[in-house]
Curated annotation (Swiss-Prot):
Major localization listed first in the record, in broad terms: nucleus
Functional summary from the UniProt entry: Component of the general transcription and DNA repair factor IIH (TFIIH) core complex, which is involved in general and transcription-coupled nucleotide excision repair (NER) of damaged DNA and, when complexed to TFIIK, in RNA transcription by RNA polymerase II. In NER, TFIIH acts by opening DNA around the lesion to allow the excision of the damaged oligonucleotide and its replacement by a new DNA fragment. In transcription, TFIIH has an essential role in transcription initiation.
GO molecular function: ATPase activator activity; double-stranded DNA binding; RNA polymerase II general transcription initiation factor activity
Subcellular location per the Swiss-Prot or TrEMBL entry: Nucleus
UniProtKB keywords: DNA damage, DNA repair, Nucleus, Transcription, Transcription regulation
Protein name: General transcription and DNA repair factor IIH subunit TFB2
The species this protein was found in: Debaryomyces hansenii (strain ATCC 36239 / CBS 767 / BCRC 21394 / JCM 1990 / NBRC 0083 / IGC 2968)
One CC-aspect GO term: nucleotide-excision repair factor 3 complex
Coiled coil regions in record: none
Subunit and partners: Component of the 7-subunit TFIIH core complex composed of XPB/SSL2, XPD/RAD3, SSL1, TFB1, TFB2, TFB4 and TFB5, which is active in NER. The core complex associates with the 3-subunit CTD-kinase module TFIIK composed of CCL1, KIN28 and TFB3 to form the 10-subunit holoenzyme (holo-TFIIH) active in transcription.
Family membership noted in the UniProt record: Belongs to the TFB2 family.
Length: 515
């Protein structure tokens, strides 16, 4: 399996693939409008906030004035997202745009507090006889979610996940086989990739598969998706009444309990509590990074005493030390973390609180054959790197910046090391990169992947037969600026653009011809 065939199951792709009529129904819910806004890139958010209180359409040419020339690629990507979601509508001439009227009205109501009382759920006004703490909710969510992951890696469990969870894992292609008799399900290639995703992506993967099954369950997919977005806007630690939910949403509660997204004292309870897994569904927070350690961080951060906080600071540290000789040491006794490491590390020795192993060509190739990518492996190692590795990396970076600045040393690209650059958010960041992992190991893992990815294919369009070199350079430079240029040959005056970029380049060529 080529590693270019990445595991894609994001909420953004799902939303963009919905019919326009379904998208319009989604925008009738203020909570959904807010959640979709949170999922947009920064420039798209800026466009929405700028046009939100405009009573007249905005000229497309004015959008260029709102962004720096260096941000044209981000502008192109943002407009592409807004068009796919039908959040912007063009007039008949194609020269002006405006926000989708339903989205505009409900998002304005959301920001001004004019939405309906139950738009974000109804808080329970009666006190609970047995109070539910945030610490308890985190513990409940951790137990539910990790039981799913442990089952996937084959850990022996006293209580296996519910049949609905097992069916979802199987229908989603994460596991295969039969769950009759002894729950004999085996993890698939997609399941291997799933394990290395961050916890938010994992949850969305299951929720989107759940959405795909709504028709078989006779459930309204819009109602289901709206409730998921409402959960992402609720307050952690608060109880909400069930009476304000629709029949479809009430029927979802049992499944959401199995995933650890909500807690109910009993099936017939008149209130439910969203867990941290639910309230961070549309959040930009990076607090929940991994299946186990990130949830443990959330658990420990809610403790109140100084002694418990000290224990939390110790447990929040990463567990993995990676040496330049490819040897790896993981200070953990978690069966789940050890099982995940075993996916791409040749483990040799196990102690009571540590495992030792080595990253080899064979272990990485086995992971690649199972559909795991080099970037996923590197990201996992960076996320779980021991705090001492991060401290040493920071010290090396500080020394390098100090040395390069004092000696006015330039980078390979010719820019001074002290030079700053602008990112997508419009803020300036240094060009230096914090290298937590040994660069030699990172490069070698990528090279082992390149051994399998010698040929890559792309869908797109070839431009050729230009009248002049000037015309070729104008179009190819524009395609490069907006990030859709895949290949160019100056001597033959040919270039190749992505499938998504053809319309933009063609429009630019038409405008040039009319001049």
């Amino acid at each position: 399996m080529s590693s270019s065939n990445l595991f894609k199951a994001t909420v953004n792709e799902h939303l963009e693939g919905l019919p326009k009529q379904v998208q319009s129904r989604l925008y009738e819910a203020p909570a959904t409008c807010l959640s979709i806004y949170r999922l947009l890139p920064p420039i798209a958010k800026f466009y929405i906030m700028t046009m939100l209180f405009y009573e007249t359409p905005v000229a497309l040419k004015d959008l260029d004035k709102w962004c720096k020339p260096t941000s044209r690629k981000f502008q192109f990507d943002s407009l592409k997202r807004l068009r796919a979601l039908h959040l912007i509508e063009e007039d008949s001439s194609g020269s002006h745009i405006r926000l989708h009227p339903t989205f505009r009205q409900n998002f304005r109501d959301c920001l001004t507090g004019s939405q309906a009382r139950n738009a974000f759920g109804n808080l329970s006004t009666t006190p609970d006889e047995q109070s539910v703490s945030i610490k308890f909710l985190d513990s409940f969510a951790l137990q539910k979610w990790e039981s799913i992951l442990h089952f996937m890696v084959g850990t022996e469990l006293s209580v296996t996940p519910s049949n609905s969870v097992l069916s979802l894992l199987k229908s989603g292609g994460l596991m295969e086989g039969t769950n009759k008799g002894g729950n004999r399900l085996n993890i698939t290639n997609s399941g291997f990739q799933f394990l290395l995703q961050d916890i938010n992506a994992q949850i969305w993967t299951l929720l989107l598969q759940y959405l795909n099954l709504t028709q078989d369950l006779n459930m309204d997919p819009v109602d289901v998706l709206n409730f998921i977005f409402i959960l992402g806007s609720l307050e952690l630690g608060k109880g909400y009444t069930v009476s304000s939910l629709s029949e479809t949403q009430i029927s979802m509660l049992a499944d959401l309990r199995d995933y650890g997204l909500i807690y109910q004292r009993s099936e017939n309870s008149e209130r439910f509590y969203p867990t941290r897994l639910a309230t961070t569904l549309t959040s930009d927070s990076a607090a929940l990074k991994s299946p186990s350690m990130a949830m443990e961080q959330a658990l420990e951060s809610t403790t109140e005493t100084e002694e418990q906080q000290n224990l939390a600071s110790n447990s929040n540290q990463g567990t993995i030390i990676l040496e330049t000789n490819f040897k790896i040491y993981a200070y953990t006794n978690s069966p789940l973390e050890i099982a995940i490491l075993n996916l791409f590390v040749h483990l040799k020795t196990r102690f009571s609180n540590m495992v030792c192993g080595q990253i080899t060509r064979e272990s990485i190739r086995n992971a690649l054959y199972n559909g795991i990518t080099a970037d996923q492996i590197i990201k996992f190692l960076e996320t779980h790197a021991h705090s001492q590795m991060k401290i040493l990396a920071k010290e090396r970076l500080d020394k390098k910046i100090e040395f390069d600045t004092s000696n006015n040393i330039n980078t390979a690209g010719g820019a001074p090391q002290s030079q700053m650059m602008t990112n997508e958010n419009g803020t300036t960041v240094a060009q230096h990169k914090l290298e937590v992992l040994p660069p030699t190991v990172v490069d070698q893992i990528k090279l082992w992947q390149l051994e399998l990815d010698r040929i890559q294919t792309f869908e797109g369009y070839l431009f050729k037969d230009f009248a002049s070199q000037q015309e070729f350079e104008a179009l190819s430079n524009y395609a490069s600026e907006i990030g859709v240029l895949l290949w160019s040959n100056k001597s033959k005056m040919k270039f190749f653009v992505t499938k998504d970029g053809i319309s933009q380049v063609a429009d630019f060529a038409s405008r040039n011809q009319r001049r």
